[in-house]
Amino acid sequence: MCDSFVVLGSSTADGRTIFGKNSDREPNEPQSIHFFPRLTGNGTDLFTTTQRVSQVSETNAILISKPSWMWGGEMGVNDKGVVIGNEAVFTKETVRRDGLLGMDILRIALERSESAEHAVKTIVELIEDYGQGANGGFTKYLYYHNSFLIADRENAWVLETSDSYWVSKKVKGSAAISNCLTLGDDFDDGHPQVIRNAENHGWHKPGKAFSFAESYEKKLIRKFSGAGTRLRRMQELLEEGEVSIERSFEILRDHENSKHLGSMRNICMHAGASLVSSQTTSSMVVVLGEKPEIWITNSSVPCLSVFKPVWFDSYESSLPFDEPEDGINYWGSWEKFIRLAILRDSKAKELWREYCLQFEQDLLLTAGKMKADDLSEQAFDKSRNIARKMTSLLEEEEVEAGFFNRKYWNRQNKKLQELKSRNFKKEIPT
């Protein structure tokens, strides 16, 4: 489960377009940030998580946040200033078992697109040529279609799909998407047979106003996933005034709808003992100025984490990770604190305000005044030390969470160690 938003420059504090996303997945699935430089192809095909795809002659440089076992990413940006976030949506069309994962579609679109509109066309072509689907879960089976929020410096688009059928809408001002369809009859473009297909299945009556969401969505999953509640809350927050980088962090940390562990109604999601449960495993804010400015947690639950700045160009990034596993190790160093904190919320929030909030504000003030490589390295190194410090202070604190949530997290902690011993290899077929 995930939530994404975009605010065009006309509605932001400094005139730059801002994108934000929380990636909500299984709590034991590490997610980390990766940089891939611009490449010139050698004619070989591309091997994604699930499929072999024809490669193009040249790809853009990209920075993506990706689950450990995937080729693609949950959210990312390229060196042309195109940013994309995807969401799982649950529709009436059958999900293919051999399609492209939405995260792989996202990465390919970033590698190939020059603008937001170009990315929309690229995604549509990929869905038509290769299909979408496959198992998107880590230790569980999870099949779904995808929606995408796509932006560049000037424009943004919402693209929603159901198998090969799709509709898209150009964003005016701001937009948010969640794990539900949002477009009714107000889309700007769509699959030529999107209405006829709904009529053929009996999902839409000819002669009545067509709504993509009403016709194609599985309403029960929308309700139990809390998607509608999260979407409405994010829309409310976006309408409260001009959005800044700091305000974007606050939006992704929001807990207005529920204080309970395991609730699917919060933008900042904490896993717990409930029938359906996910956790925010990484968060990203992208500011689209002359050069993309990325603020990433590379750790779970943003309300207990620190957003850190990263910059990149076509061939280099300021990301202080030398090896792919460095990002996973950083995620793990914070996870020790996160798992103590979730069960000791009051004391954890005190520590976060004391150690993290001021540090994050200092980073915001320093951004642009220090060499990018130095600031990113300092941000990741110091935040890792902060996590260790808070862990040591929290270990002796009394647990506040109830019996069932304590049992839930005991199971998750044991499972995390098992997965770590296997280098977080996926347990079930994709």
Please give the residue ranges for each predicted region.
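A contiguous strand-loop segment
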Residues: 1-102, 122-244
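Acidic, low-complexity N-terminal propeptides/linkers enriched in Ser/Thr/Asp/Gly that mediate export
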Residues: 4-11, 16, 275, 373-430
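Second-shell loop/turn segments in exported
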Residues: 105-112
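Short, charged, surface-exposed loops that flank catalytic or proteolytic processing sites
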Residues: 112-120
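Residue-level signal for secondary-structure boundary elements
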Residues: 118, 131-135, 260, 371, ...
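Short, well-structured alpha-helical segments that form the helix of a local strand-helix-strand
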Residues: 119-128, 245-259, 376-383
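Accessory, solvent-exposed terminal regions and/or long lumenal/extracellular loops of proteins
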Residues: 241-269, 273-278, 359-360
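Substrate-recognition/cap regions that form aromatic- and gly/pro-loop-enriched pockets
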Residues: 270-396
